[in-house]
Curated annotation (Swiss-Prot):
It holds the Pfam family Anticodon_1. The gene is valS. It is an enzyme of class 6 (ligase). Signal peptide: none annotated. Belongs to the class-I aminoacyl-tRNA synthetase family. ValS type 2 subfamily. Keywords: Aminoacyl-tRNA synthetase, ATP-binding, Cytoplasm, Ligase, Nucleotide-binding, Protein biosynthesis. PANTHER family: VALINE--TRNA LIGASE, CHLOROPLASTIC_MITOCHONDRIAL 2 (PTHR11946:SF93), VALYL-TRNA SYNTHETASES (PTHR11946). PROSITE patterns: AA_TRNA_LIGASE_I. This is Valine--tRNA ligase. NCBIfam families: PRK13208.1 (NF009687), valS (TIGR00422). Its main location: cytoplasm. It comes from Rickettsia akari (strain Hartford). GO terms for cellular component: cytosol.
Length: 812
């Protein structure tokens, strides 16, 4: 190029380079390269469940920093993109977008609408991810609802069935009455809600009054026992007696249990099927009867009492309380704040129903999973405790059944054949993927089977996201075993911290159960993107940032710069100031390269193409040599930080070096020598230009993982027609060093700082001429003295001996 472009138009250039990178397949994975030379990423498949937001940009770019670095140090990169486009989150999006309800229409019709919405939403993701320059190989893309993914997911199910790690049982489960489906423990969240503690009068068979405190009087028809603590002296006399429930006059046993909290309420607790997990424990332990009064729709089913039959739960609670008050069976009510288990998606309070479901054995593997958590490299390490706390808190096996439509079906039927009614029939591996509503088990007719109508929890499929890319579950359930062996276990799982208890946990569980291994060696956990006031972004607050607007205003590189300024794992507020700093950096890089472009035609082509090792002897000036030493220190430090996934530290070191050491000091100090207008020092000029040229080349490479467009543009203008982002284009000058006295160059900078401060305090131009500089505390070499005279505009410099502290007297 004979002329440096006048301006940098980020809109045009970013789009240009994105198209070129795709066309040249810069980011393509090579399946012929060994596992040892390959870096494999288990990319988070974004949930197709709503609007794109700045949080997507924030977390995905942080992964891309590491991936680009690994590619540049020579790794073959397997970096796919997937879409988690099945399950309840997607169904809720479709219902909201189309103003429909799944249960009000045919299953096939609803699934077809889901597929149409998913296709449109995924295209938005692709467009955004290309705009922010994620260096994924799009040929590796997968969808969790695709035929291949359904096959892999069903393989996972059958493999765990074969291994005895999955079972079906009619047992109490968490139920969301709004979405009409069973949920797993990880799908719930605790919410603080205001309620009332109602003190209700029961009687013993002998007529003794007992007061029981409860927040759920609507469950009185399902009361099966009353419990007290065995050490509670108030109630020891109740042993072997029975109580009579108010209103319904049912006789229930009075039983002792250490699970009762003596200081809560009255110390007497009614056990119902089911109010909470303690009720389940008592029901199982004491072999109590089952009374089910709550329906899947969250209404009361109790035809014996028409006053509450058919009412919604809250309505039934109010009605029961009114009747109890009428009959003077409530002694008092206390307003309380209690923790209620709610569905994470719908927000509805959960019920506990007894429904046949599929479960993955989890509780029995808690100790093994804690060991797995410790084997994993956590980035940052303090995130490990979140998984450990979750594993310790697990009290339910993983329920993977969902009573929805748009998901991966269970490859299961139930026999109606005479003599084997209810027998579970599993699909053969050759049939996968199967839809039991349309397909049949081998050897059975349609009339002989009942299909399983449920679909799998979306986490049951996304928990095998590594295997969705490797196309294999285990030795016995594989589509491509060779591909799997080359890619699994993977190197990196990047994800957000709020899904450690779901995606991270379930993926670790599945890999442990399938192949007795970890799914990856490293987990990189990102924080949240917060609003500028550090509050959580939400539509209700109106503070959600739309990426498209920011991209239009600032461009991809500036947004990536903002993301790179956030330490891994930390919650970070969006900042206009940081965005502006990113814009300044892009402009400064452009202008610095423009200056170098002016001079680089003075260099020999062979020296331009050479490495620093090859041209070491041609960098003759002491200050230039100091600059190269500092550059090598930077390269080593930034490389070390990126190898440890500390991208923010690497970015900070590089940026500080560029602004302070390179631009503010080196470039200004060497500028006169670079021009050498009077041809006084041709050797010094060549040394300076050579240093400028190669230092900037390396700085562009260090910046490349973070701001890929501007670095590519400048790299192509100054250095090469090949992409800066190609495999193996990092730098390594670990043992390159000039044996110079560093105090000399650092002394030069210290003197310059003093002079600059003096001129600023006296409102003088930085170029204002100085008659004499009197310097004490150091004596610079002739070379450095000449550079100092040039940069300070000093006619003469006098050194007045060595000392502990540098002092400068400026004389005009």
């Amino acid at each position: 190029m004979t002329e440096f472009p006048k301006n940098y138009n980020f809109t045009e250039n970013e789009k240009k380079w994105q198209q070129i990178w795709q066309a040249q397949q810069i980011y393509a994975y090579d399946p012929n390269i060994s596992k040892e030379e390959t870096y494999v990423v288990d990319t988070p498949p974004p949930t197709v469940s709503g609007q794109l937001h700045i949080g997507h940009v924030y977390s995905y770019t942080q992964t891309d920093f590491i991936v680009r670095f690994q590619r540049m140090i020579g790794k073959n990169i397997f970096y796919p993109m997937g879409f988690d486009d099945n399950g309840l989150p997607t169904e809720r999006l479709v219902e909201k977008q189309k103003q429909i309800k799944a249960y009000n229409m045919g299953r096939d019709e609803f699934i077809k609408i889901c597929e149409e919405v998913v296709e449109s939403e995924e295209e938005k993701f692709r467009r955004l991810f290309n705009q922010i320059a994620l260096s994924v190989d799009w040929s590796l893309e997968y969808q969790t609802i695709s035929p291949l993914s359904r096959k892999i997911s069903q393989m996972s199910f059958l493999d765990l069935v074969k291994k005895g790690k999955i079972y079906r049982n009619d047992q109490p489960i968490l139920w969301d009455p709004v979405d009409g489906t069973a949920l797993a423990q990880a799908d719930i969240e605790d919410k603080a809600k205001t309620s009332f503690m109602n003190y209700i009068i029961f009687k013993t068979e002998q007529g003794e009054s007992l007061t029981i405190a409860t927040t759920r009087p609507e469950l009185l028809p399902a009361c099966i026992a009353v419990f007290y603590h065995p050490d509670d002296k108030r109630y020891k006399h109740l042993a072997c007696k029975s109580a009579i429930t108010p209103l319904f006059n049912e006789k229930v046993p009075l039983l002792a249990s250490p699970l009762v909290q003596q200081d809560k309420g009255t110390g007497l607790v009614m056990c119902c099927t089911f109010g909470d997990q303690t009720d389940i424990t008592w029901w199982k332990t004491h072999n109590l009867p089952l009374k089910t009064i709550i329906t899947k729709k969250g209404t009361i089913n109790f035809p014996h009492n028409i006053a509450i039959d058919g009412l919604k739960i809250k309505e039934a609670r109010i009605k029961i309380i009114d009747i109890l008050k009428e009959q003077k069976l409530i002694t008092k009510q206390e307003e309380i704040t209690q923790t209620v288990k709610c569905a994470e998606r719908s927000g509805a309070p959960l019920e506990i129903l007894t429904v046949p479901q599929w479960f993955v054995k989890t509780i029995s593997h808690k100790e093994a999973l804690l060991k797995r958590a410790n084997e994993l490299n956590w980035r940052p390490n303090n995130m490990k405790i979140r998984l450990e706390n979750w594993i310790n808190a697990i009290s339910w096996d993983w329920c993977i059944s969902r009573q929805r439509y748009f998901g991966v079906p269970f490859p299961v039927w139930y026999s109606k054949r005479v003599g084997e009614e209810g027998k579970i029939l599993y699909a053969d591996i050759s049939q996968l993927p199967v839809d039991p509503l349309k397909d049949l088990p081998i050897g059975y007719s349609k009339e002989e089977v009942e299909p399983d109508l449920d679909v799998m929890d979306t986490w049951a499929t996304s928990s095998v996201s590594p295997q969705l890319s490797t196309h294999c579950i285990s030795d016995n359930f594989a589509v491509n075993k060779d591909r799997h062996n080359k890619l699994f276990p993977m190197d990196l799982r990047p994800q957000a911290h709020e899904i450690i208890r779901t995606w991270a946990f379930y993926t670790i569980l599945k890999a442990h159960l399938h192949q007795n291994t970890l799914p990856w060696g490293n987990i990189m956990v990102s924080g949240w993107c917060l609003a500028e006031d550090r509050s959580k972004m939400s539509k209700s607050k109106g503070n959600v940032l739309v990426p498209e607007k920011l991209l239009e205003q600032y461009g991809s590189d500036v947004i990536r710069y903002w993301s790179a300024n956030s330490k891994l794992g930390a919650d970070t507020a969006y900042s206009e100031d940081v965005m502006k700093n990113g814009k300044r950096l892009v402009n400064k890089l452009w202008n610095a390269c423009k200056f170098i472009f002016i001079h680089c035609n003075k260099l020999k082509d062979v020296d331009k193409k050479a490495s620093l090792f090859d041209i070491k002897e041609q960098i003759t000036n002491e200050f230039d040599q100091w600059m190269i030493n500092k550059l090598v220190e930077l390269v080593n430090a930034a490389t070390n930080e990126l190898q440890n996934y500390e991208y923010a530290n690497a970015m900070h070191l590089t940026e500080k070096f560029f602004w302070v050491i390179f631009c503010d000091n080196y470039l200004e100090i060497s500028k006169t020598r670079s021009y050498d207008e009077e041809n006084k020092n041709p050797q010094g000029q060549y040394s300076s230009i050579l240093t400028l040229y190669h230092v900037m080349q390396i700085l562009l490479k260090l910046f490349a993982p973070f701001i890929p467009h501007i670095t590519e543009e400048l790299y192509q203008i100054l250095y090469s027609e090949n992409s800066i982002h190609v495999k193996g284009n990092w730098v390594n000058y670990g043992d390159l060093h000039y044996g110079i006295d560093v105090t000399q160059s650092e002394g030069l900078i210290a003197i310059l700082d003093i002079v600059r401060k003096f001129k600023a305090e006296n409102n003088l131009s930085i170029k204002a001429p100085i008659k004499l500089l009197e310097v004490s505390g150091i004596e610079l070499s002739a070379e450095l003295t000449e550079d100092l005279k040039n940069v300070t505009s000093a006619e003469e410099i006098q050194f007045e001996g060595q000392g502990d502290k540098i002092k400068v007297n400026v004389i005009f």
